[in-house]
């Protein structure tokens, strides 16, 4: 192997070793390692299951800690071993081993970039699960079909990221598509990844519902908010709530819901409305709807505080109906984020859930 290529490998490995050490400091590796020992000890005690909720919380914390501790441990050891092996292989002019180390360096780079990306998650709610609301805009069938395309896109994205996704509510369109839907996404940093998707998404295409093949523009809004837990205090006065029950909508068949199990809760002071119909139990639907309401109220309060403290310009604080964030122009094979100017020509890949280029750019630019 030529000397210049060897020098590049050596420089990369040295750089990765420095970055790995910097990440240990930034991500509190030592403190997390100690905490992981404590959590493991608690989980090994059979008495922990006397309080199932506490045990589940510990299980989630363990997974989160292991995600950092194990990754950094393996990465640090891997880079150190590669550096040592590189010295031997270079001295012996062992090209096969040097090429293998070069391939390992590519893997180290990917893992480092994944950990470094976590530095973008500055919001205290970023590690939490989240809810994602989709609402079709004006325009009837065309807009409702677009809303259903977005629903599919985010479900595909969840699949790619390894998130658990559950459709809690889905209101069908009159002819095709959906009027609205709510998804619950569970996974590490689900809210952190998806929070910059809040806004209006614009579709331009030749409509399949127009026999003349005319070009149509449609809009749908997306709103993402974290699932809050007991560590986030959200007070809800029962007197401020109006609770309605209704029969869940659906295509029918032998499993059609014959009872009024779907629940809609209106928070009258804020005007926030949430609904849940995914379970046959009215009690469980009500509990899920209350969780959604508390999460929305928390996100609303956080946005108010952010606006007051940072006085961000309108383009960053306005998440109303008129705030377009992304334009999907399908007949020109172009999807462009209007905040970061990231543009992708492979429209089908994006609609199949490959949103990482947009999301990463948004987080890096602090959108």
From Swiss-Prot:
Gene Ontology annotations of biological process type: viral translational frameshifting
Residues the record lists as N5-methylglutamine modifications: 254
InterPro entries membership: PCRF (IPR005139), Pep_chain_release_fac_I (IPR000352), Pep_chain_release_fac_I_sf (IPR045853), PrfB (IPR004374)
Keyword set, alphabetical order: Cytoplasm, Methylation, Protein biosynthesis
UniProt key word Cytoplasm: yes
Cell compartment(s), UniProt: Cytoplasm
PROSITE patterns assigned to the protein according to its UniProt record, in alphabetical order: RF_PROK_I
GO CC terms, sorted: cytoplasm
Pfam families from the UniProt entry: PCRF, RF-1
One function term, GO molecular function aspect: translation release factor activity, codon specific
Protein's UniProt keywords contain Protein biosynthesis: yes
Modification note: Methylated by PrmC. Methylation increases the termination efficiency of RF2.
Family designation: Belongs to the prokaryotic/mitochondrial release factor family.
Further details from the record: The gene for this protein contains a UGA in-frame termination codon after Leu-27; a naturally occurring frameshift enables complete translation of RF-2. This provides a mechanism for the protein to regulate its own production.
Cited function: Peptide chain release factor 2 directs the termination of translation in response to the peptide chain termination codons UGA and UAA.
Matches recorded under NCBIfam families: prfB
Protein name as catalogued: Peptide chain release factor 2
Gene source species: Bordetella avium (strain 197N)
Lineage: Bacteria, Pseudomonadati, Pseudomonadota, Betaproteobacteria, Burkholderiales
Gene that specifies this protein: prfB
């Amino acid at each position: 192997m030529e000397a210049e290529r060897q020098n590049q490998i050596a420089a990369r490995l040295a750089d990765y070793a420095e970055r790995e050490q910097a990440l240990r400091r930034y991500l509190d590796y030592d403190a997390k390692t100690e905490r992981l020992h404590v959590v493991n000890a608690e989980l090994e005690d059979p008495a922990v299951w006397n309080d199932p909720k506490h045990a589940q919380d510990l299980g989630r914390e363990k997974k989160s800690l292991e995600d950092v501790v194990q990754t950094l441990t393996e990465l640090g050891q891997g880079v150190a071993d590669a550096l040592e092996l590189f010295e031997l292989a270079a001295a012996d002019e062992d090209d096969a081993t040097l090429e293998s180390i070069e391939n390992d360096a590519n893997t180290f780079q990917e893992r480092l970039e994944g950990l470094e990306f976590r530095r973008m998650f500055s919001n205290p709610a970023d590690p939490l699960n989240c809810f994602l609301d989709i609402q079709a805009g004006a325009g009837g069938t065309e807009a409702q079909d677009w809303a259903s395309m977005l629903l599919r896109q985010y479900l595909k994205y969840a699949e790619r990221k390894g998130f658990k996704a559950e459709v809690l509510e889905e209101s069908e369109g009159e002819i095709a598509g959906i009027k609205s839907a709510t998804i619950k996404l569970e996974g590490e940093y689900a809210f952190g990844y998806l929070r910059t998707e809040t806004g209006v998404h614009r579709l331009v295409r030749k409509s399949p519902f127009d026999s003349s093949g005319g070009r149509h523009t449609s809009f749908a809004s997306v709103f993402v908010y974290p699932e809050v837990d007991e560590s986030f205090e959200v007070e809800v006065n029962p007197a401020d709530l109006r609770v309605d029950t209704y029969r869940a909508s659906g295509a029918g068949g032998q499993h059609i819901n014959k009872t009024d199990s779907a629940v809609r809760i209106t928070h009258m002071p804020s005007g926030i409305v949430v609904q849940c119909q995914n379970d046959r139990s009215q009690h469980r639907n009500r509990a899920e709807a209350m969780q959604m309401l508390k999460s929305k109220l928390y996100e609303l309060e956080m946005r108010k505080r952010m606006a007051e403290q940072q006085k961000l310009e309108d383009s960053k604080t306005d998440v109303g109906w008129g705030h377009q964030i992304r334009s999907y122009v399908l007949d020109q094979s172009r999807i462009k984020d209007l905040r970061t100017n990231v543009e992708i020509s492979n429209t089908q890949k994006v609609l199949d859930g490959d949103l990482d280029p947009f999301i990463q750019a948004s987080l890096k630019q602090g959108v």
